[in-house]
A protein has these predicted regions:
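An intracellular "coupling" helix at the cytosolic face of ABC transporter transmembrane type-1 domains
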Residues: 14-15, 111-112, 128-137, 141, ...
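Transmembrane helices of ABC transporter permease
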Residues: 15, 19-29, 74, 139-193, ...
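Alpha-helical segments in transporter systems
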Residues: 18-39, 64, 68, 86-87, ...
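Transmembrane helix-loop-helix hairpins at lipid-water interfaces of multipass membrane proteins
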Residues: 20-78, 160-164, 279
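Helix-loop-helix
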Residues: 50-52, 157-171, 245-314, 319-320
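Juxtamembrane loop-to-helix connectors within ABC transporter transmembrane domains
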Residues: 83-87, 105-152, 210
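ABC-type nucleotide-binding domain
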Residues: 329, 335-585
Length: 585
């Protein structure tokens, strides 16, 4: 994604350049009405002032009035067309296109990105970009085109009366406007800091709402409130600093704004007194003075608003548009799984210069083999799973599925070939039907219900007031841990992928649920290559082979019975079992 702010904006503007061009033309016509009106009014005043009531050229007066009416009518029509195109054609498409692209790119980021960044912060950055894009469009059209058209036409009409006067006014106005624009650039760093802290505050707020149960259960509301207050205080101080410099610059702009009007007023009378400027010319300059001074001031104000919006977009893109850690390689092809054998070949992995978690790790998993991973926390079990899912990339060696390097295939095809049941079930705040169907988005209701029955969650679902149409709440909080996990397993059953990964998939289940689930897992695992991280003996006994890991290395390998006979590390875990769980602590 483009990280340069102006290139980012132009990328989307050029997709609607014809609509944008029509908008600019209609806006220019609309803004030309004011100086044209002033010019015609001065002509009408000239006709009246140069003749008495008996000698007024009513034909000339009538023509000017007719032209004035036509111009005002054209301005109204142009304004109506502009508003329609802007609100119906331009803004909806513009914002929708940017929203879709941001959504797509954000979801290309690695799991590490989402683990390290607060969800609320990401959302705040997206909102800042979308809102600031609209502000920049508005400020460029209204804040720049409006004053430019007004100033140029005003100078042109004054030049018809006196070219020298027009030149003097134009130069003075250009100097003052430039001075205002330059001084307002000082607000940029203040705006950027405020935008950054505001996003952090919003992220903290969302994080607190997401974890409301945790805050209440630990009685730590006062602690969270204090932390939020500290962050909010920093944000408020940044806003004060921004507002302070902005207020000073606004005062300076207003002063210069009035200076332009006063200068034009004085010059009109000087030219009238010394150089014979007509009464109509004086009226013209005075009438245009307010519009020109307002336009010059508007240029400065809008320069500051654009700078602020620029800072917010820049801040957002620095996070959201950073290069993706995990990307499909050039020419990546879809993964084709026929057998589903898996090979880890001399795999090395470490993160940010830390000690290696895996060093020349080798493991071959045959087609349809069920592998159980056992070991202390930090032994490397979860790392293996994340590398196989390509949540992270290996630092050396390779991982193959059916002799295809997973780094050379598309991530989408890789993930569609693997059904993953994590320790903590992830559910959307949607209906149970939608959550299970996520395993196969085209599945019928009957197929969803069949999967739910195999996962032994059909009975508790039908007991809910709305059955399969019941909402599960934020992250599934309306359900118990065991119920959430059974829905997660039903989703994996529906997906029916050739490779199955179980990451403590039954750890959250009570003994009765676990009894039913073990039977459904037997059906689920048939004909699939399975990798399971498990501590339940009932799960481990079903594995064809157990891999005991320590410090990223395999220290034992064999079936449950074989490893017990060896009386090694697994035997030690087994002897420390408690209530059906082996102790790996």
């Amino acid at each position: 994604m483009e990280t340069n702010v102006w290139k980012f904006i132009w990328k989307y503007l050029k997709q609607v350049k014809y609509i944008f061009f029509i908008l600019l033309i209609s806006f220019s016509i609309d803004e030309a009405v004011q100086p044209l009106t002033a010019f015609l009014v001065s002509k009408i005043v000239g006709v009246i002032s140069e003749n008495n009531a008996q000698n007024i050229e009513f034909m000339t007066l009538g023509k000017n009035l007719l032209v004035l009416a036509i111009i005002m009518f054209i301005g109204d029509i142009s304004n109506t067309i502009r508003r329609y195109i802007e609100e119906v054609k331009f803004k909806p498409y513009f914002q929708t296109k940017v929203s879709v692209d941001l959504f797509n790119y954000v979801h290309k980021h690695s799991i590490r990105f989402f683990n390290e960044e607060m969800a609320g912060n990401i959302i705040a950055k997206v909102n800042n970009i979308l809102n600031s894009l609209v502000e920049i469009y508005r400020d460029v059209t209204f804040g720049i085109i409006h004053p430019v058209v007004t100033i140029l036409l005003s100078v042109f009409f004054i030049a018809l009366e006196s070219p020298l006067l027009a030149a003097i006014i134009f130069v003075f106005e250009a100097i003052v406007a430039s001075l205002m624009i330059i001084t307002r650039k000082r607000i940029t760093p203040y705006s950027a800091r405020h935008a950054k802290l505001f996003a952090e505050s919003e992220g903290f707020f969302v994080d607190g709402v997401t974890n409301a149960n945790l805050i209440k259960s630990f009685g730590n509301f006062s602690f969270e409130r204090l932390n939020f207050y500290k962050l909010l205080k920093k944000t408020t101080n940044a806003l004060r600093a921004e507002s302070k410099i902005s207020s000073l610059l606004d005062s300076l702009t207003s002063f210069l704004f009035d200076t332009i009007g006063l200068f034009m007023f004085i010059m009109a009378f000087v030219w009238w007194y010394f150089f014979g400027l007509s009464t109509a010319g004086v009226v013209l300059v005075i009438t245009l003075s307010r519009g020109m001074s307002y336009s010059a001031g508007n240029l400065a104000f809008m320069a500051s608003f654009i700078t602020k919006a620029y800072g917010q977009i820049k801040d957002g893109l620095e996070l959201l548009a950073k290069p993706c850690e995990i990307e499909d390689c050039e020419g990546a092809k879809p993964l084709k799984v026929k057998k589903a054998d898996i090979n880890f070949r001399n795999v090395n992995y470490q993160y940010n210069g830390q000690p290696k978690l895996l060093n020349k790790f080798n493991l071959e998993i045959k087609t349809g083999e069920k592998i159980g991973l056992v070991g202390h926390s930090g032994a490397g079990k979860s790392t293996l799973i994340k590398l196989l899912l390509r949540f992270y990339d290996v630092n050396g060696g390779k991982i193959e599925i059916d002799k295809q390097n997973i780094a050379k295939v598309t991530q989408d095809s890789l993930h569609k070939s693997i059904a993953y049941v994590p320790q903590e079930a992830s559910l959307f705040n949607r209906t149970i039907m939608e959550n299970i169907r996520y395993g196969s988005t085209n599945a019928s209701d009957e197929e969803v219900i069949a999967a739910a029955k195999k996962a032994f969650c059909h009975d508790f679902i039908t007991e809910l007031p709305n059955g399969y149409n019941s909402k599960v709440g934020e992250r599934g909080v309306m359900l118990s841990g065991g119920e959430r996990q059974r829905i997660s397993i039903a989703r994996a059953i529906l997906k029916n992928a050739p490779i199955l990964i179980l990451d403590e998939a039954t750890s959250a289940l009570d003994s009765m649920s676990e009894k039913y689930i073990q039977q459904s897992l037997k059906e689920l695992m048939k004909g699939k290559t399975v990798i399971a991280i498990a501590h339940r003996l009932s799960t481990l006994k079903e594995m064809d082979r157990l891999i005991v890991m320590e410090n990223g290395k395999i220290i034992e390998s064999g079936s449950h019975k074989e490893l017990l006979k060896q009386k090694g590390a697994y035997y030690g875990f087994y002897n420390l079992q408690s209530e059906g769980f082996i102790n790996t602590k």
